[in-house]
């Protein structure tokens, strides 16, 4: 109990992915809870669990997902509890509870995210074309990982994990409707209407004999706000930030340079 009392403190609860201490008087982001090492216990012998008194915070291991009230609503209070249990004797347990307040969302932040979503949808074709003309694709296209705003507030695209992890939250491709990992289908985030010409997922181009139109389809969601579409299903703002279908039709130039003759 002494170890839990000493280590489960406000200073040891950080915002996920940062070293910033979470604001107990106004939580705004997801949480990284103290691991066994931080609590001074051996994970081999002790189990650490976290729980909340309300569904404003949910836990999966050491990650706490924070659900903020809708913009314009009041702040909410919740209690976060750390429970350490001896794996060999469940009666040996220690707990400690801390009080937190969850801050409502900011309408201006939501408005900015809506603008980012619209920009990502509008720029989808340009992003995957990788500098090519939609009417004359001759090389591989490029699947992106995230759309975000750069330091100058301009739309930017991440194509690699290092950048994706470094730039913070943004708009990301999510599983397309109908995807089933058990079905053996190859597409998940980037679907192609003609896989013989443009491959799914990585969008590699195989030059056809004739000029061929191909449609690429994805579904975009806000990393930060998509979860709220399910929590607040009647809120139109959140609906626009989750599962937004987008597509781009391109023409891949064939070796003949001709349009396929119509069969009569």
Role assignments for model-derived ranges:
Residues 1-264:
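Beta-rich interaction/scaffold domains
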